[in-house]
Amino acid sequence: SKLDQDFVDTVRAAGGFNETRYLMVPSNRADAWTAMHKSFTLPTDPANRLIVSVHAYSPYDFAMNENGYKEWDGSKIGDLSFIDSLKSTYIDNGVGVVIGEFGATNKDNLEDRVRWADDYTKKAAAAGICCVWWDNGGTKVGTENFGLVDRIGKKIYYPEILDTMLKNYNEQ
């Protein structure tokens, strides 16, 4: 988009380390599938140092929809196929990818969230894609409760989720 191109041009023209630093560029709405659609094109970058940034709460009915399903047994792992598509579209062509927002809202289903985070980050790590959990501080049961870390109390609410994600990236 013009906005993405203006961003790259402005940062590159600012001088200093800005001429070669990596820049993250979102697709339309930062949507993972939109990033792979022919309507999305990366801006031109003389430094050739762009990273595609997407958000991916998938599958939606598990990850975000309060009224969706709360069990994760791996049977819907096909809903994570966008990771393979991001890899073949970008990673395999020398462009980095960051899933800058992902997570599964708390539905009082910790064990299922751990299994989901394991499947999700194992697949992403194997593809060379970094994931950033959307930690909005919410720990109640229901929509938009993605909290993992108590920043004030300096403790981890759900170490099992964090541990499985770190394990998957440390094994790569």
What are these regions (language model features)?
Residues 1-68, 84-104, 126-127:
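Active-site region of glycoside hydrolase catalytic domains
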Residues 29-34, 77, 105-114, 139-140:
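Acidic-and-aromatic substrate-binding clefts and catalytic sites of carbohydrate-active enzymes
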Residues 79-87, 116-121:
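Short, acidic/polar
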